[in-house]
Swiss-Prot record:
Matches recorded under Gene3D superfamilies: 1.20.5.170
Tissues where the protein occurs: Highly expressed in the lung, lower expression in the brain, thymus, liver, spleen, intestine, kidney, heart, muscle, and ovary. Not significantly expressed in hematopoietic cells.
Keyword check for Cell division: no
Function according to Swiss-Prot or TrEMBL: Since they lack a putative transactivation domain, the small Mafs behave as transcriptional repressors when they dimerize among themselves. However, they seem to serve as transcriptional activators by dimerizing with other (usually larger) basic-zipper proteins, such as NFE2L1/NRF1, and recruiting them to specific DNA-binding sites. Interacts with the upstream promoter region of the oxytocin receptor gene. May be a transcriptional enhancer in the up-regulation of the oxytocin receptor gene at parturition.
Pfam family, one: bZIP_Maf
Name by which UniProt lists this protein: Transcription factor MafF
Annotated spans, Basic motif: 51-76
Keywords: DNA-binding, Nucleus, Repressor, Transcription, Transcription regulation
Phylogenetic lineage: Eukaryota, Metazoa, Chordata, Craniata, Vertebrata
SMART domains xref list: BRLZ
Family membership: Belongs to the bZIP family. Maf subfamily.
Region (Leucine-zipper): 79-93
Annotated organism of origin: Mus musculus (Mouse)
Annotated gene: Maff
Subunit structure: Monomer and homo- or heterodimer. Interacts with MIP. Forms high affinity heterodimers with members of the CNC-bZIP family such as NFE2L1/NRF1.
Keyword Transcription regulation: yes
């Protein structure tokens, strides 16, 4: 098997170019501006220039991907925190709503009892002494809280 002297010479030249390639660390390669990189790559073969530029692009993309992952994790944690806070608020509002419903039911019961009482008093006095339901409702004492409405409405 004969070795072509021309091809071995080309291989030797290629190895020499590789040996003359500036040894840049990954950090240095990424840290260079494009202008500085091009200045450092002057005199190298097109293949070496392409290889180094591709390596730089790969390293930069890797860094961008890592920072994107970190950002996504931080956003996810923040959203989970907000979700927990909102769930606590929903639970609190549900408890308040249930308490208000119980209070409303109790007030409805009192209102109906008073209306029944007013009807029985009116029936005992006769048709001439009918008491309007609104006048009965206005005499009901309510628990301290918001001021009673000036024009009370029926219980339903």
């Amino acid at each position: 098997m004969a070795v072509d002297p021309l091809s071995s010479k080309a291989l030797k030249v290629k190895r020499e170019l590789s040996e003359n390639t500036p040894h840049l660390s990954d950090e240095a390669l990424m840290g260079l501006s494009v202008r500085e990189l091009n200045r450092n790559l002057r005199g190298l073969s097109a293949e070496e220039v392409t290889r180094l530029k591709q390596r730089r692009r790969t390293l930069k993309n890797r860094g961008y991907a890592a920072s994107c992952r970190v950002k996504r994790v931080c956003q996810k944690e923040e959203l989970q925190k907000q979700k927990s806070e909102l769930e606590r608020e929903v639970d609190k509002l549900a408890r308040e709503n249930a308490a208000m419903r119980l209070e409303l039911d109790a007030l409805r019961g009192k209102c109906e009892a008073l209306q029944g009482f007013a009807r029985s008093v009116a029936a005992a006095r006769g048709p001439a002494a009918l008491v309007a339901p609104a006048s009965v409702i206005t005499i009901v004492k309510s628990a301290p809280g918001p001021a009673p409405a000036a024009d009370p409405a029926p219980c339903s």
